[in-house]
Amino acid sequence: MTSLSVLSCKLLFKLAITSHCELYSFFPLVCYTIFDFEDHDLSNWTLNGTAFSNQPTYGDNPSERLKNDPTRKEPSKHQGHWWIGTYENRSSPSHPAGEKQDDEPQGSMTSPGFLIDANFLTFLIGAGCQNFETRAELIVDGDVVFETNAERHHHSCMETMFEKKWNVSGFTGRQAQLRLIDHSSGDWGHINFDHLQACHKLP
């Protein structure tokens, strides 16, 4: 790195500089993404059963399969292009939009480990809300410390995802995993999930 480059880093950012001009701010990002499925790759995840075999899902598949039902306007509201939806069967852009695998398949998917280094985890969740047979879990050092389904204030299930959060400030510095569960084949027996973030404070 030239002396001019180093000087530029110092003047523009007033931050510590490594040999690669890697910058460490005194004001870190409020939130950063842990898992968003945009790499379309679950090879590092542990899959059990068949519910997650066709995942992740591409695009707003619920809107396409519900387009002829005027009583249900339930866009997925996912982030980016890819997300998890165990009712859906669209695992590539070339696959016909609107295809589904229904509620019958069951299974789980467990993430690789990650370090908790923020106060909150936020995520998008939707679909199954009637019981905890479909849920998201946070596992810390092998124990389930949080679990949630897609229950809303009005107690009705929807494909549309909305944000929930876990306060993980008591687990800072510990290793964690995310586990998604679909153990239901009944009505609303599926889970939608996307965009797990770590947040130092809530935006």
Where in this protein do the model-derived segments appear?
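Short beta-strands within extracellular/lumenal beta-sheet-rich domains
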Residues: I84-F120, F162-K165
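Extracellular carbohydrate recognition
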Residues: P105, S184-K201
